[in-house]
Swiss-Prot record:
S-S bonds: 107-205
Pfam families to which the protein is assigned, alphabetical: tRNA_Me_trans (PF03054), tRNA_Me_trans_C (PF20258), tRNA_Me_trans_M (PF20259)
Sequence segments annotated as region (Interaction with target base in tRNA): 102-104
Active site: 107 (nucleophile), 205 (cysteine persulfide intermediate)
UniProt name for this protein: tRNA-specific 2-thiouridylase MnmA
Site positions per UniProt: Interaction with tRNA: 133, 350
E.C. number(s) listed in UniProt: 2.8.1.13
Main subcellular location: cytoplasm
Source species: Shewanella sp. (strain ANA-3)
């Protein structure tokens, strides 16, 4: 097991305790390294806080049980107002504009590594914070700090953390980033932690498991419209463009069409002006493919970013294979990205995250697609 910053032994670390196995093992590993460890549990959602939807109470119970087992303090904090103002309203605005946002990325930026870090600094006098994310940090001889992909390729979460600043990365520790997921569970089981076999959380950051269309419909009125083929034939109805994303295959309700082949139907475009969902057959339909994209709202971990003309790789969604590409800066905040080969289902509103080998450089928001 790789050691974590032995030169900082004795420093105070506040661990974001979620009630899951990754944060539980993070706290244990840091204690083993000699850090002074305390936990902090965040509650960030108030609406619909009931047994059906919200597991916050159960998560807090598990976090407390782990901290009791490890013999460390557990603090609690409510960031619901910050979450609503800085994450959820952005999430709704993007969907209303017809884009597909990634709330987990904004949640990390505004809550886990901003509000949390501020609280750990101002109230708990922390030297570092730590999270159970599968990423790594590297401190270089020149004083710079880089964020690296996690050792477990299947669990690497650097895509969700590209908005972190150099300063935030330098103040953060990521113990499980050096491990495979199965190793984390094995450590938790060996230590008798209640979370060792707890299911990984999915769904919207901090909002949890719920029916997405029903949940979104509580905040944005649905606007049903036509489903058309790429050739303009009306073949069905959709319940709202905000519920659909490029490349989507399931839930379209248009199977068994006459005069069509057996290839599955995919969302290939969204016509916002006409409120029309455009579909085509086959996962490599021409309307689904892009030769490149324009990316704005750029953020680079090292503040500088890659050089003009750099040939690096990009991910346009989580767990995607690396896409080789070439970069051209159109201005300080807009990047033209040309793929080596056409790519399917690149989605405006999602994040494009760039890598040089194992180093996460940063990224931005996909604004426009380059086709043809």
């Amino acid at each position: 097991m790789t050691s974590i910053e032995p030169t900082h032994t004795g420093k105070k670390v506040i661990v974001g305790m979620s009630g899951g196995v990754d944060s539980s093992v993070s706290a244990y590993l840091l204690m083993q390294q000699g850090y002074q460890v305390e936990g902090l549990f965040m509650k960030n959602w108030e609406e619909d806080d009931n047994d059906e939807y919200c597991a916050a109470a159960e998560d807090l119970k598990d976090a407390q049980a782990v901290c009791d087992k490890l013999g460390i303090k557990l603090h609690t904090v409510n960031f619901a107002a910050e979450y609503w103002d800085n994450v959820f309203e952005y999430f709704l605005a993007e969907y209303k504009a017809g884009r597909t946002p990634n709330p987990d990325i904004m949640c990390n930026k505004e809550i886990k590594f901003k509000a949390f870090l501020d609280f750990a600094d101002d109230i708990l006098d922390a030297d570092y914070i730590a999270m159970g994310h599968y990423v790594r940090r590297r401190d270089n001889a020149d004083g710079t700090t880089q964020m690296l992909r996690g050792v477990d390729n299947n669990k690497d979460q650097s895509y969700f953390l590209y908005t972190l600043s150099h300063e935030q990365v330098a103040r953060s520790l990521f113990p499980v980033g050096e491990l495979e997921k199965h190793e984390v569970r094995e450590i938790a089981k060996k230590m008798g932690l209640i979370t060792h076999d707890k299911k990984d959380s999915t769904g919207i950051c901090f909002i949890g498991e719920r029916k997405f269309t029903e949940f979104l419909g509580n905040y944005l009125p649905a606007q049903p419209g036509n489903i058309e083929t790429a050739e303009g034939e009306i073949i069905g109805k959709h319940q709202g463009l905000m519920y659909q994303t490029l490349g989507q295959r399931k839930g379209l309700g248009i199977g068994g069409m006459k005069n069509s082949n057996d290839d599955p139907w995919y969302v290939v475009d969204k016509d916002l002006k006409r409120n029309v969902l455009v579909v085509g057959q086959g996962g490599h339909h021409p309307r689904l493919m892009s030769n490149g994209m324009l990316v704005n709202q750029l953020h680079w971990v090292d503040r500088k970013g890659p050089a003009e003309g750099s040939q690096i790789v990009v991910k346009t969604r989580y767990r995607q294979q690396d896409i080789p590409c070439t970069l051209t800066y159109l201005d300080d905040n807009t990047l033209k990205v040309v793929f080596d080969e056409p790519v399917a289902a690149v989605t405006p509103g999602q994040s494009a995250v760039f890598y040089d080998g194992e180093v996460c450089l940063g990224g931005g928001i996909i604004d426009q697609l380059i086709r043809g």
